[in-house]
């Protein structure tokens, strides 16, 4: 391992994750034109952000960096795959891993896996429907579109906010930080779908100031205790989201993990590990 990589990993354990993220969140909400314009311009140049797809294409027209970062796209920018039964990719990014959930563990990187039960907040009953199922992990890079959409239509059953660390998420940390995705702060959303139970886990990372959902708004920042909110109670109006509907967003981004139960879906040949994907592309089909 290169010395600079060793230093980076050491800094991940030493850094005050949540303080850094809160400070970044304050800066990202700054409305002072000179400051926010400098931040946006530097970001666009560094990461080569394609603004031609954005609903508002002038990057300096946004009031804050966060508004720019969570920009909406033109209606025609992400057409949804029309194959019957298609399960869609929920976000722009790259497939970092996908495959079966084996012995209650999800593959992270060579030599590393993490607990399905821990990922979903530590409740074995919550994890049970996904034992022996399938997962896909999608990493959102800084230049990507950072809104997350439904892979298929679903009715919300439960949302769980799991506090945790905020390690950076990238190939280096995935390879060297054990249980990375089950240690970082995350929001797990469980749905009932035509393919059975589905979970979408939005994982935070260093400088991810907040995670929001379409129905609850701001879910993070950091709280000390796991919070689970049921949405399938008789007293509550059901929350149903159509295929392709927006379900959440990152203010600065990280990772989305999609889970299905056993025998429900098969990943298509289209997504490949480390390969780029776009929201709305075909990700999986129902198993025969």
UniProtKB/Swiss-Prot annotation:
Active-site residues (renumbered): 92 (charge relay system), 149 (charge relay system), 254 (charge relay system), 254 (schiff-base intermediate with substrate)
Topology within the bilayer: Peripheral membrane protein
First-listed, main subcellular location of the protein, grouped into a coarse class: membrane
Site description Cleavage (non-hydrolytic), residues in chain: 253-254
Catalysed reactions, as listed in the record: a 1,2-diacyl-sn-glycero-3-phospho-L-serine + H(+) = a 1,2-diacyl-sn-glycero-3-phosphoethanolamine + CO2
GO biological process, one term: phosphatidylethanolamine biosynthetic process
PTM annotation: Is synthesized initially as an inactive proenzyme. Formation of the active enzyme involves a self-maturation process in which the active site pyruvoyl group is generated from an internal serine residue via an autocatalytic post-translational modification. Two non-identical subunits are generated from the proenzyme in this reaction, and the pyruvate is formed at the N-terminus of the alpha chain, which is derived from the carboxyl end of the proenzyme.
Keyword tags: Cell membrane, Decarboxylase, Lipid biosynthesis, Lipid metabolism, Lyase, Membrane, Phospholipid biosynthesis, Phospholipid metabolism, Pyruvate, Zymogen
Recorded metabolic or biological pathway in which this protein acts: Phospholipid metabolism; phosphatidylethanolamine biosynthesis; phosphatidylethanolamine from CDP-diacylglycerol: step 2/2
Cofactor: binding comment: Binds 1 pyruvoyl group covalently per subunit.
Metal-binding among keywords: no
Modified residues (Pyruvic acid (Ser)): 254
GO MF term (any one): phosphatidylserine decarboxylase activity
Localization per record: Cell membrane
EC number(s) stated in the UniProt entry for this protein: 4.1.1.65
InterPro entries: PS_Dcarbxylase, PSD-B, PSD_type1_pro
Gene Ontology CC annotation, any one: plasma membrane
Cofactor (UniProt): pyruvate
Family as reported in the entry's similarity comment: Belongs to the phosphatidylserine decarboxylase family. PSD-B subfamily. Prokaryotic type I sub-subfamily.
Complex and partners: Heterodimer of a large membrane-associated beta subunit and a small pyruvoyl-containing alpha subunit.
HAMAP family: PS_decarb_PSD_B_type1
Function per UniProt: Catalyzes the formation of phosphatidylethanolamine (PtdEtn) from phosphatidylserine (PtdSer).
UniProt-recorded name of the protein: Phosphatidylserine decarboxylase proenzyme
Source organism of the structure: Bordetella petrii (strain ATCC BAA-461 / DSM 12804 / CCUG 43448)
Top-level taxonomy: Bacteria, Pseudomonadati, Pseudomonadota, Betaproteobacteria, Burkholderiales
Gene: psd
């Amino acid at each position: 391992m290169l010395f600079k990589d060793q230093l980076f990993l050491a800094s991940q354990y030493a850094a005050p994750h949540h303080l850094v993220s809160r400070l970044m969140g304050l800066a990202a909400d700054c409305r002072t034109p000179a400051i926010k314009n400098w931040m946006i311009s530097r970001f666009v140049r560094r990461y080569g952000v394609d603004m031609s797809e954005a609903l508002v294409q002038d990057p300096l027209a946004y009031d804050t960096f966060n508004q720019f970062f969570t920009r909406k796209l033109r209606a025609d920018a992400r057409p949804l795959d029309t194959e019957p039964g298609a399960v869609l990719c929920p976000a722009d990014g790259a497939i970092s891993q996908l495959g079966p959930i084996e012995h209650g563990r999800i593959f992270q990187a060579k030599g590393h896996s993490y607990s399905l039960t821990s990922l979903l907040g530590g409740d074995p009953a919550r994890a049970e429907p996904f034992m022996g199922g399938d997962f896909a992990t999608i990493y959102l890079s800084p230049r990507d579109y950072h809104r997350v959409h439904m892979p298929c239509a679903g009715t919300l059953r439960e949302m769980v906010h799991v506090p945790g660390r905020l390690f950076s998420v990238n190939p280096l940390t995935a390879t060297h930080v054990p249980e990375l995705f089950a240690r970082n702060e995350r929001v797990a959303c469980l749905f009932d779908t035509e393919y059975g139970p589905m979970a979408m886990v939005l994982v935070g990372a260093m400088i991810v100031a907040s995670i929001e959902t379409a129905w609850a708004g701001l879910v993070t920042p950091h709280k000390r205790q796991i919070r689970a909110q049921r949405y399938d109670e008789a007293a509550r109006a059901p929350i149903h989201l159509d295929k392709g509907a927006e379900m959440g967003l990152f203010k600065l981004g990280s990772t989305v993990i999609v889970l299905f139960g056993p025998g429900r879906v098969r990943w298509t040949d289209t997504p490949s590990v480390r390969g780029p994907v776009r929201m709305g592309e075909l990700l999986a089909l129902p198993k025969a």
